[in-house]
Structures are given as structure tokens and as C-alpha cells.
A protein has these predicted regions:
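Short loop-beta-helix segment that forms the pyridoxal 5′-phosphate
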Residues: 1-23
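PLP-dependent enzyme catalytic core of the Aspartate aminotransferase-like
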Residues: 4, 250-253, 262-301
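Conserved PLP-anchoring active-site segment centered on the Schiff-base-forming lysine
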Residues: 24-43
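Helix C-cap/helix->beta junction micro-motif
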Residues: 52, 106-107, 219, 251, ...
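Active-site phosphate-binding strand-loop segment of PLP-dependent enzymes
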Residues: 57, 61-113
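Active-site C-terminal subdomain of aminotransferase-like
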Residues: 107-110, 117, 122-227
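Conserved PLP-binding catalytic core of the aspartate aminotransferase-like
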Residues: 203-211, 217-252, 262, 266-267, ...
Length: 301
């Protein structure tokens, strides 16, 4: 069902999303190959590429000119894999997948997209960023997790039949790790059915997301280039990030502090993440509480 949902031949299920990236990348590329990553890719991608023994190259976040500069230096006939988050987990912005696909054809590359934060949010019935851009067939491997929109634990990789069969017999994090718990798998499967059968949930998610984006911008928050229900509220001070988180919790607002190593010291933020079950009234209460806190801390005027 996962493979069909993602528009691929087959899929493998892992016990965690982290183990998907760490395991898959360690075996789909190797010595003499090249793996090219956005410098804001998830830590599991970083660990996977290190384990692969391939030459690791990075480009500036969502900078397609820099990606092309990296690709221009590589042999045309070499194995080259571009690995990118579909939605970046801290910033909330999207990978420029149309431009990456153009470069794939120009420089003879393959593409792997991490849909951890795109699944259940973008595309038809929440199929992800690849579907949102209409580029599912151009992406060679699609990775996803059960721990975000599917409200469980686990992960998967979807692709063509031969590649998935190869991974089934070579991927160490799949072979030498316990299978996902039946209850967790069943919960994720039921969540997938809800995505397919209850489109009004996705509509509500985007309704409250667009409302929150508008209100935070009106109040003068720095939220960067987010295009998703992940809304970063930049603090740019480690100590104040913790203070804001504590004060927000006391005010009845749950936010996640993001500090090194998840970001650079000058880029600390709190992450305001939305669900389909939130209402505009709840969002407004959150915006008002955070506006008061951020102003008291001198973060916004």
C-alpha cells in the first residue's frame, strides 16, 4: 500500500526513519561514487553518506547555482546521487525539486528525497513533495517516516523493484534490526487510510497553517522562507530560546527549542508546528501568547 501511495513499484519498512537514511545511503553508493547533499539535510542523511565511503559533497541550502557548480566538477559517467529533504525540518521550506530534476538530466544523476515532513502534508491526499511538484517518476528513491503525519514509529523506502530487492538483501539497518512492532505498523497503516479517505483533514491543516503564517508575519516575527506547517520563530540566542520555550509552556503553548547541533548557534529558533486538529482560535491564542513573550524578551518590537 505504501508503494502504491508513493507511486513506486515496491517499499521496504524499517523500525525507524533514521535507520532508513543511515542504512540505504550506506549501500546504494560506495567508493568511487559521489553523494551530493543540501547542507541543511537531516542528520540521518549525514550519517548514511559517511557510512557509504562515497565522496561526500555539499551545496549551500537550496542554492541551485551552487549545486550546479558542484556537479560540473564531477565525471559524467560516475554514479552521482543527490539526496535532499523534501521539506526541511527546521526551516519549513521546500527543496527546489523542479530545478534539481533539471540538473539530474543535465549531469546524469539520481535523486533520493526524504519525505519525512512532506508526507501527509503536500500533494494529492498528502503523498508528499514529489507528488506536489508532479515529479514522482523523476525521483529514484522516496524515503518517509511513520513518526510525523502517520503518528506512529518507523520508516520506509520506496523505489523500483530491483533497487528495493537489492536493499532487502544488503541494507544492514534492515537486516540486522528488529522489525517494526505490529501495533506501530497497524497504526501507521490506519493513518494512511485516514489520509486517503478524509481529505478534509488536509484542508483544515492548510487553513490553520495559512492563518498562522499570516498572523506571525503581521506581528513582526522572523519566520524565514517556510512554506509548510513547520513555522520557525527565530530567536538567534541560545539562552533566550530556552527562556521562550519555558514561558510558552507556562502559558499553555507547546513549542520545540532548536539549538546546536540541530542548527548553527546564530540560527536558534523555536518550532511552532501545526496539526489538522488545531483551530484558528487556538492558533490565535498561541500567536498572542508568543507575541507577548517575544516582545518581553526583546526579540521582536
Amino acid at each position: 500500500e505504501l508503494a502504491a501511495f508513493e507511486g513506486k513499484d515496491e517499499a521496504l519498512v524499517f523500525s525507524t526513519g533514521f535507520s532508513v537514511n543511515a542504512g540505504v545511503l550506506s549501500v546504494v553508493v560506495g567508493r568511487g561514487d559521489y553523494v551530493i547533499c543540501d547542507d541543511r539535510d537531516h542528520a540521518s542523511i549525514v550519517d548514511g553518506r559517511r557510512l557509504s565511503f562515497a565522496t561526500q559533497l555539499r551545496y549551500k541550502h537550496n542554492d541551485m547555482e551552487d549545486l550546479e557548480r558542484v556537479l560540473q566538477r564531477l565525471p559524467q559517467e560516475a554514479v552521482k546521487l543527490i539526496v535532499v529533504d523534501g521539506v526541511f525540518s527546521m526551516e519549513g521550506d521546500l527543496a527546489n525539486l523542479p530545478a534539481i530534476v533539471e540538473l539530474k538530466h543535465k549531469y546524469n544523476c539520481s535523486i533520493m528525497v526524504d519525505e519525512a515532513h512532506g508526507l501527509g502534508v503536500f500533494g494529492r491526499q498528502g503523498r508528499g513533495v514529489c507528488d506536489y511538484f508532479g515529479l514522482t517518476d523523476e525521483v529514484d528513491l522516496i524515503m518517509g517516516t511513520f513518526s510525523k503525519s502517520l503518528a506512529s514509529i518507523g520508516g520506509f523506502i520506496a523505489g523500483d523493484k530491483d533497487t528495493i530487492n537489492y536493499l532487502r538483501h544488503t541494507c544492514r539497518t534492515y537486516i540486522f534490526s528488529a522489525s517494526n512492532a505490529p501495533a506501530a505498523t497497524a497504526a501507521a497503516l490506519e493513518a494512511l487510510h485516514i489520509l486517503e479517505q478524509e481529505p478534509e483533514r488536509l484542508e483544515q491543516l492548510w487553513k490553520v497553517t495559512n492563518y498562522a503564517l499570516k498572523r506571525f508575519r503581521e506581528e513582526g516575527f522572523e519566520i524565514g522562507d517556510t512554506e509548510s506547517p513547520i513555522i520557525p520563530l527565530y530567536v538567534r540566542d541560545i539562552e533566550k530560546t530556552f527562556v521562550v520555550t519555558k514561558l510558552a509552556y507556562e502559558a499553555g503553548v507547546f513549542i520545540n527549542p532548536v539549538i546546536p547541533p540541530a542548527c548553527a548557534p546564530q540560527d536558534t529558533l523555536v518550532r511552532f508546528a501545526l496539526m489538522a486538529t488545531h483551530t484558528e482560535e487556538q492558533v490565535e491564542r498561541g500567536v498572542q501568547a508568543l507575541t507577548k513573550i517575544f516582545k518581553a524578551q526583546g526579540i521582536i518590537k
